[in-house]
Amino acid sequence: MENLISLVNKIQRACTALGDHGENSALPTLWDSLPAIAVVGGQSSGKSSVLESVVGKDFLPRGSGIVTRRPLVLQLHKIEEGSREYAEFLHLPRKRFTDFVAVRKEIQDETDRETGRTKQISTVPIHLSIYSPNVVNLTLVDLPGLTKVAVEGQPDSIVKDIEDMVRSYIEKPNCIILAISPANQDLATSDAIKISREVDPTGDRTIGVLTKIDLMDKGTDAVDILEGRAYRLKFPWIGVVNRSQQDINKNVDMIAARRREREYFNSTPEYKHLANRMGSEHLAKMLSKHLETVIKSKIPGIQSLINKTIAELEAELTRLGKPVAADAGGKLYAIMEICRSFDQIFKDHLDGVRPGGDKIYNVFDNQLPAALKRLQFDKQLSMENIRKLITEADGYQPHLIAPEQGYRRLIESSLITIRGPAEAAVDAVHSLLKDLVHKAISETLDLKQYPGLRVEVGAAAVDSLERMRDESKRATLQLVDMECGYLTVDFFRKLPQDVDKGGNPTHSIFDRYNDSYLRRIGTTILSYVNMVCATLRNSIPKSIVYCQVREAKRSLLDHFFTELGKMETKRLSSLLNEDPAIMERRSALAKRLELYRSAQAEIDAVAWSK
């Protein structure tokens, strides 16, 4: 069971070392979940004397006004009988104090280091561990004494500042409140009882300690309070008799003071029946036992919190990415790895692993055929246009058998309109590839970490796509131009010949320009153009895929990689510039993760019985 208090002691020290003081922050706090005993009392309530009685040593700064200006986490460790007593501070890990006067001075000096030689307060705790055969295993948090007025040298807000600090500790459900109240004052005016009642109205977490019982007016006693009739708490009140100022001035040691305290309760008729549960020795043992019980009950919940928070911290650190390498080689490698991640995500979109690539097929299967169907060949092949072009093609010598030059001009003028849908298909695929680049950039976590690199990679990828688009447009339009430049002769050879059985032409040279003749030419040309459209409907997608999609998968960032190899260290560094807020957040998260992992290891190492 003693291991449990030691466990919490270790975790508390780790919290302070790694900056977790339980303050409100954007980071998860382990400090707030740890069971602790907070010592609360007004100034001159005897709070310091109670702590020194529990420890058995004079070690706390004394004086008028606010003496305790930072939380003091006091961790007591029982060691073997005959061993020498010593103290250690967390901020001086390799120094042992055997002189407790020096301990008092170091508490004062460390307070001044944080707050300056003023009467300001600080929430950053001081950790003091005391090792002695005369103590029980126990952890207490000594908080600044509550006050009602600011004195000279203190800010006007000091009353509220102290109250807020005390409240921040005792309002936590895992905090045990040790409320120190002087018996020679009306309990209704007790600062400790007042504030503890506000945060613990049922009294389930509050342990009442009554000091200065021996200083009460003659004819009065504290029996009603100690027996719980005046103010009931879940745990019995404990009375203590501290050393007087005269005793302190005479350096009366704690052993003698404890003996006199026992004698007082045993010999005073009003308290004799309560003597077995009075005094600082009983208080220390009771607190140690109660703290062990609370820790044991809270450990499973703390373990669950630690495991959950570790997962959350690791996830956020993953989202923020790794810190930047210092050397040029490391920077170049980091950039290359990030670019490869982006490139793979882009390929995954094209290959169907991620959504988006199917839209390219939609261009080929729907948009291109629909655009080809919308071409108005009937306008090109109207009677007037056919007659006009054939007549112009004949010139001053009319054709003898078939108007070949007219055919060619009509076919060329029809096929040339296919360039529009072909070019539109190239542009549509280019637009989709750009969209996939932007998607891949947004899905590459490391690029979110480096805005400069994100812009450069995006620009380089789009530049590559534009070069590929230009090449695709050239190759695709060349397919259309090839169809215009050379006709498929076999198509015309296979057309049925319009001759009678005698082999004489049906149309004479004089009626070759009539509507029937021109209609026949239009029908023939339309059949040929439709055949070419069917061919291009298959070949245009092949050209686009070869020149754009395939090339984008193969060499999207090749030009960027070439330029990257030429960059100087300064330029590489600029690509990996991070938002300072992200850098600070990552550092804070890494420290907090270290704390939680340390706590997890400490808990796992302790064999505690359920």
Swiss-Prot record:
InterPro entries: Dynamin, Dynamin_GTPase, Dynamin_GTPase_CS, Dynamin_N, Dynamin_stalk, G_DYNAMIN_dom, GED, GED_dom
UniProt entry tagged with the keyword GTP-binding: yes
Domain (Dynamin-type G) ranges: 31-300
Region (G4 motif): 211-214
Keyword annotations: Cell cycle, Cell division, Cytoplasm, Cytoskeleton, GTP-binding, Hydrolase, Microtubule, Motor protein, Nucleotide-binding
GO molecular function, one term: microtubule binding
Residues covered by region (G3 motif): 142-145
Cellular component terms (Gene Ontology): cytoplasm; microtubule; phragmoplast; plasma membrane
SMART domains reported for this sequence: DYNc, GED
Listed Gene3D superfamilies: Dynamin, middle domain, P-loop containing nucleotide triphosphate hydrolases
Region (G1 motif): 41-48
Domain GED span(s) in chain numbering: 518-610
Sequence positions that bind GTP: 41-48, 142-146, 211-214
Region: G5 motif, residue numbers: 241-244
UniProt GO BP: cell division; receptor-mediated endocytosis
Region ranges (G2 motif): 67-69
Subcellular location, record wording: Cytoplasm, Cytoskeleton, Phragmoplast
Pfam family, one: Dynamin_M
Keyword Hydrolase carried by entry: yes
Main subcellular location: cytoplasm
Entries under CDD domains matching the protein: DLP_1
Family listed: Belongs to the TRAFAC class dynamin-like GTPase superfamily. Dynamin/Fzo/YdjA family.
Function of the molecule: Microtubule-associated force-producing protein.
Protein name: Dynamin-related protein 5A
The species this protein was found in: Glycine max (Soybean)
Upper taxonomic lineage: Eukaryota, Viridiplantae, Streptophyta, Embryophyta, Tracheophyta
